[in-house]
Design a protein with these regions (language model features):
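ABC ATP-binding cassette signature C-motif
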Residues: 1-201
Length: 202
């Protein structure tokens, strides 16, 4: 429950995120970002349980807003390990980008955010609209880089091309009417956006 509201945004939600990429889909303001922040411990629930508890996991988060500086930016700037070099190569990160984040374009800043998130090699990685502000070639770079991640990946995105290329399952936020109440439910369906949409329609 957020301050100033009497009803919880999410109530009775039960979702399991498996290894691989799960796309979180639904209308704006329905609770997608809230759910993902709960999953990685950036928000705490009023009730219910998250298992395993986020403090037992190494988590990564890439925000939607490109103005937010990655928490590990300085570490990434000084990281010349083979893993970091491969991430830089895949995403086309300039050597000087981490030292001048305020001068980067939206697409460049987004790539740098994603690079920093991947460089921490997290158990769970949440990406909120990772292809905002990018053109098609950059999207392809991002997709190629994300395919190398083998943990639990959670995508909040409206980019159908990205979801179809990456997701092995989709968590669909849907509005339902149960016992006289309008509630939000989350249904996890197998496959990418196209497959999950067909499954939901059947």
């Amino acid at each position: 429950t957020y301050p100033g509201t009497s009803e919880p945004l999410l109530d009775g939600i039960d979702v399991t995120f498996a290894r691989g990429w799960t796309a979180v889909l639904g209308d704006n303001g329905i609770g997608k970002t809230t759910l993902t922040k709960l999953a990685i411990g950036r928000l705490s629930p009023d009730a219910g349980r998250i298992s395993p508890t986020p403090n037992r996991l190494h988590t990564g988060y890439c925000p939607q807003n490109t103005d937010e500086t990655p928490e590990n930016l300085e570490d990434f700037a000084c990281d010349w390990s083979p893993q970091a070099m491969e991430i830089r190569r895949e995403l086309g990160i300039g050597d000087d980008w981490p030292w001048r984040p305020g001068t980067l374009s939206g697409g460049e800043a987004k790539r740098l955010q994603i690079a920093c998130a991947l460089a921490t090699d997290p158990d769970v990685l949440v990406l909120d609209e990772p292809t905002n502000h990018v053109d098609r070639p950059t999207r392809e770079r991002i997709i190629a880089a994300l395919r190398s991640y083998d943990g639990i990946g959670i995508l909040v995105s409206h980019d159908v091309a990205l979801i179809d290329a990456m997701a092995s399952s989709c968590a669909l936020f849907e509005r339902d009417h149960v016992r006289g109440r309008n509630i939000t439910v989350v249904r996890v369906r197998p496959g990418n956006y196209s497959a999950a949409s067909m499954d939901a329609a059947e």
